[in-house]
Amino acid sequence: MSQLIDRRQNAGKKSTVNRQRFLRRYKSQIKKAVSEAVGKRSITEIDQGEQITIPAKDIYEPQFHRGHGGHIERVLPGNDNFIAGDRIKRPSGGGAGGAGGNASDSGEGEDNFVFELSREEFLELYFEDLELPDLVKKELARISTYKTVRAGVTTSGIPNNINVLRSMKQATGRRVALASPYKRRLKEAEEELERLKQLANPDKIDLLKLERDIEFFKKKIQTVPFIDTIDLRYNHRVRVPSPSTQAVMFCVMDVSGSMDEAKKDIAKRFFILLYMFLTKNYEKIELVFIRHHTSAKEVNEEEFFYSRETGGTVVSSALELLNTIIEARYPPQAWNIYVAQASDGDNWNADSPYCQELLQEKIMPLLQYFAYIEIMPRHHQSLWEVYQQVKERYPNFAMENIDNVADIYPVFRELFKRKTV
């Protein structure tokens, strides 16, 4: 049975290179369209592709063409309606098309350019220039991550690892070394035999001796094997520790009674955005989801986003659980630890100072970054005030306010924007 192997880099899509060139050339217009599309999407649609529209004027390229002046007379091939000298009527019709432009007496127009972005292209543009702040390499404690690398060749191994080229080179060198002396002496004997045969009365004993020598040398050359086991060379591969930066992100969300459905929807959108960003850009990262009201608990992703459990508000319960999990599973010397918290800022007044104490004395010294978003269109409360004091003490503590859905993406980019050197 025949088997087709397609080694084309574009996987059969001939326009892939042109598409990538187009995305690079009009990146600013496409990114603007992507940003506008984000605010119109629901949670379940956030990671899908997008139909992008670019105004025709933005993709205009200079080109050579005939000037409007001058005079030219010609009849195109295949014409059976006009002869030289006829005047062609202007096309009838109204304004020019394209982006609702003003009316034109030319009867011509140009539509906006519309094309589809794939999911991968959409996310690539969506999360460009973002990163986990201050990601540093920690010691590789208890990390069993290895990669196999080439380490030259060896004289022993399994058949699958035979290096054919090196083996044939080795065999060629061995054959040359072993057969060359016999080939040289064979050539000399054949020349001497030819010389004796040209004599009038050659010595038959000498002729017989030379013929035996020639036969001996030929047998010696034939006994040199084409390839021997000592010629075989095998690719040598070794496993080496693979340096990897591992990180853990804690997602903490307030689900108390003061968080109405609109606020919860904003918080869910923010964390889904964060989740997509982390899973796309980092292979070695773990996510821990913590929901809290008067009590906190660690939950899975499904329960974190869609559970309807509610209650009062004690933020310190989430911070205590956060600290407990870090101490039990994520030693700071081996993990880069990040926390993102979303709340409406409504907290039991007596609990806010304790939250400040937990952050300053226990949690912040262990973290790389803490991002707090408060979904509060009205005045801030005690939790925001104590968090501001934490921010003054720790530069790796960031705070932002979100009023509505439209603020999610700008705030997200501000919290996780890539630092330029």
From Swiss-Prot:
Residues of the region (Disordered) are 83-110
**Where does this protein have coiled-coil stretches?**
none
What Pfam families does this protein's entry cite?
DUF444
Cross-referenced InterPro entries: UPF0229, vWFA_dom_sf
Compositionally biased intervals (Gly residues) = 92-101
User: Which PANTHER family does UniProt cross-reference here?
Assistant: UPF0229 PROTEIN YEAH
The family line of this record is: Belongs to the UPF0229 family.
Protein's name according to its UniProt entry: UPF0229 protein lpp2857
